[in-house]
Amino acid sequence: MSGKSLLLKVILLGDGGVGKSSLMNRYVTNKFDSQAFHTIGVEFLNRDLEVDGRFVTLQIWDTAGQERFKSLRTPFYRGADCCLLTFSVDDRQSFENLGNWQKEFIYYADVKDPEHFPFVVLGNKVDKEDRQVTTEEAQAWCMENGDYPYLETSAKDDTNVTVAFEEAVRQVLAVEEQLEHCMLGHTIDLNSGSKAGSSCC
């Protein structure tokens, strides 16, 4: 891959057993292990990609979903560029816990502007037949909690896995572009000492 690569840190968050490790491994190694164990603490993998002409190194952090590992995972939230809130469509409780994960991340990552932070919501395990959460319910949650993109994925059969991580990159790039636009539009007239132009920040 040629050209300067942008390093982006992405955090996978959600209850234990929703398939965060499987999503990461499917995306980076294109492998699926049905016997995978729960993550203890954190793990991360890198993958280089190109999205809309931008070269990116995606650093994907997979976190332990169990409450007893909270002290191990939360220090790694800082510096994250995007958060993938993940639940399993066949586990109602994992969906209902999304709000708690969102709040935990915002607090421990010290997010300064939660309304504009790029969250992406993933409904994983769509290969399962006994789903407990409908697409419409998940989309409604996303609209109510920040108008987040929602994607349904399956690490097992590789449904929307690449699309999900590329969407995360697009969300980060969109926020950065908006910030750059704000800074360019917010200029200072040195002669008068007053600010000229407009700001969208």
Swiss-Prot record:
<protein>
    <recommendedName>
        <fullName>Ras-related protein Rab-9B</fullName>
        <ecNumber>3.6.5.2</ecNumber>
    </recommendedName>
</protein>
<dbReference type="GO" id="GO:0042802">
    <property type="term" value="F:identical protein binding"/>
</dbReference>
<keyword id="KW-0597">Phosphoprotein</keyword>
<dbReference type="Pfam" id="PF00071">
    <property type="entry name" value="Ras"/>
</dbReference>
<dbReference type="InterPro" id="IPR001806">
    <property type="entry name" value="Small_GTPase"/>
</dbReference>
<feature type="binding site">
    <location>
        <position position="33"/>
    </location>
    <ligand>
        <name>GTP</name>
    </ligand>
</feature>
<keyword id="KW-0968">Cytoplasmic vesicle</keyword>
<feature type="short sequence motif" description="Switch 1">
    <location>
        <begin position="31"/>
        <end position="42"/>
    </location>
</feature>
<dbReference type="InterPro" id="IPR027417">
    <property type="entry name" value="P-loop_NTPase"/>
</dbReference>
<keyword id="KW-0342">GTP-binding</keyword>
<dbReference type="GO" id="GO:0005764">
    <property type="term" value="C:lysosome"/>
</dbReference>
<feature type="binding site">
    <location>
        <position position="21"/>
    </location>
    <ligand>
        <name>GTP</name>
    </ligand>
</feature>
<dbReference type="GO" id="GO:0019003">
    <property type="term" value="F:GDP binding"/>
</dbReference>
<feature type="modified residue" description="Phosphoserine">
    <location>
        <position position="34"/>
    </location>
</feature>
<keyword id="KW-0479">Metal-binding</keyword>
<keyword id="KW-0449">Lipoprotein</keyword>
<feature type="binding site">
    <location>
        <position position="21"/>
    </location>
    <ligand>
        <name>Mg(2+)</name>
    </ligand>
</feature>
<dbReference type="GO" id="GO:0003925">
    <property type="term" value="F:G protein activity"/>
</dbReference>
<dbReference type="GO" id="GO:0015031">
    <property type="term" value="P:protein transport"/>
</dbReference>
<feature type="binding site">
    <location>
        <position position="39"/>
    </location>
    <ligand>
        <name>Mg(2+)</name>
    </ligand>
</feature>
<keyword id="KW-0653">Protein transport</keyword>
<feature type="binding site">
    <location>
        <position position="62"/>
    </location>
    <ligand>
        <name>Mg(2+)</name>
    </ligand>
</feature>
<feature type="binding site">
    <location>
        <position position="125"/>
    </location>
    <ligand>
        <name>GTP</name>
    </ligand>
</feature>
<feature type="binding site">
    <location>
        <position position="39"/>
    </location>
    <ligand>
        <name>GTP</name>
    </ligand>
</feature>
<feature type="lipid moiety-binding region" description="S-geranylgeranyl cysteine">
    <location>
        <position position="200"/>
    </location>
</feature>
<dbReference type="GO" id="GO:0042147">
    <property type="term" value="P:retrograde transport, endosome to Golgi"/>
</dbReference>
<feature type="binding site">
    <location>
        <position position="19"/>
    </location>
    <ligand>
        <name>GTP</name>
    </ligand>
</feature>
<dbReference type="GO" id="GO:0005886">
    <property type="term" value="C:plasma membrane"/>
</dbReference>
<comment type="subunit">
    <text>Interacts (GTP-bound form) with SGSM1; the GDP-bound form has much lower affinity for SGSM1. The GTP-bound form but not the GDP-bound form interacts with HPS4 and the BLOC-3 complex (heterodimer of HPS1 and HPS4) but does not interact with HPS1 alone. Interacts (GTP-bound form) with NDE1.</text>
</comment>
<keyword id="KW-0472">Membrane</keyword>
<comment type="similarity">
    <text>Belongs to the small GTPase superfamily. Rab family.</text>
</comment>
<feature type="binding site">
    <location>
        <position position="65"/>
    </location>
    <ligand>
        <name>GTP</name>
    </ligand>
</feature>
<feature type="lipid moiety-binding region" description="S-geranylgeranyl cysteine">
    <location>
        <position position="201"/>
    </location>
</feature>
<dbReference type="GO" id="GO:0006898">
    <property type="term" value="P:receptor-mediated endocytosis"/>
</dbReference>
<dbReference type="InterPro" id="IPR005225">
    <property type="entry name" value="Small_GTP-bd"/>
</dbReference>
<dbReference type="GO" id="GO:0005525">
    <property type="term" value="F:GTP binding"/>
</dbReference>
<keyword id="KW-0378">Hydrolase</keyword>
<dbReference type="GO" id="GO:0032482">
    <property type="term" value="P:Rab protein signal transduction"/>
</dbReference>
<keyword id="KW-0547">Nucleotide-binding</keyword>
<dbReference type="GO" id="GO:0005829">
    <property type="term" value="C:cytosol"/>
</dbReference>
<feature type="binding site">
    <location>
        <position position="34"/>
    </location>
    <ligand>
        <name>GTP</name>
    </ligand>
</feature>
<dbReference type="GO" id="GO:0045335">
    <property type="term" value="C:phagocytic vesicle"/>
</dbReference>
